[in-house]
């Protein structure tokens, strides 16, 4: 039997890996950071060199990369991704948490993927006003994998796709947890704190409010396939 000599391929070898971008989107409390951590640890088990980058201004859970339930991982804090490009070039897998806060996220991820890195980004897709958060959505057409997670609505316990701000701040970047934000469903997004629907013609809500917030209109009457008298006539005939 003849033997075939296979080349020695080491995990993380720049000449053997194929770059890609994976994007994890969703509202707050949907498990984005948890999923990012799971994927990075999966590569670590396979002996890949990994680097996690976190937003430097988010100091809620010390300098570590942390999920809301306090699972932590070593991370490199940064405000601009170009400031850590040398560290990123020394690894095979790059995880980026709170990707929506980095203004150079698209350029960085594309360059790293083109150089053979696997880049995994966890980010909010929308602001508290349900508008695109920074340039993060520009990653979608560049990514090999995109997933949007949902949370549990913190007001009615249904599926939640949006982030609702509890305070009155108007600026987009306000870092906080459950003290400042709720994950909410479509209906609860448009409710005021009192539980009443938002006013349709208010300047703050008119752009995002649906056309109707009351009870959905009843569907027109459906014609029955077999009326009662039709069934009775058939019985008499038999």
From Swiss-Prot:
Q: Where in the cell is it found?
A: Cytoplasm
Please list the residues that make up the active site.
98 (proton acceptor)
Positions binding ATP in this chain are: 26-33, 58-60, 97-100
PANTHER family found in the cross-reference section: THYMIDINE KINASE (PTHR11441), THYMIDINE KINASE, CYTOSOLIC (PTHR11441:SF0)
Add the further remark from the entry: Two forms have been identified in animal cells, one in cytosol and one in mitochondria. Activity of the cytosolic enzyme is high in proliferating cells and peaks during the S-phase of the cell cycle; it is very low in resting cells.
Encoding gene (name): TK1
Signal sequence, start to end: none
Q: Which residues form a coiled coil?
A: none
- Source species: Bos taurus
Q: How is it modified after translation?
A: Phosphorylated on Ser-13 in mitosis. Phosphorylation of Ser-13 by CDK1 during mitosis reduces homotetramerization and catalytic efficiency when DNA replication is complete and intracellular TK1 is still present at a high level. Polyubiquitinated. Postmitosis, ubiquitination leads to proteasomal degradation. The KEN box sequence located at the C-terminal region targets for degradation by the anaphase promoting complex (APC/C) activated and rate-limited by FZR1.
Q: Membrane-spanning residues where?
A: none
Q: What protein name applies here?
A: Thymidine kinase, cytosolic
Q: What SUPFAM superfamilies is this protein classified in?
A: Glucocorticoid receptor-like (DNA-binding domain), P-loop containing nucleoside triphosphate hydrolases
Give the modified residues of type Phosphoserine: 2, 13, 235
The answer, when asked if DNA repair is one of the entry's keywords, is no
Of which family is this protein a member?
Answer: Belongs to the thymidine kinase family.
> What does the entry list as the binding residues for substrate?
128, 172-176, 181
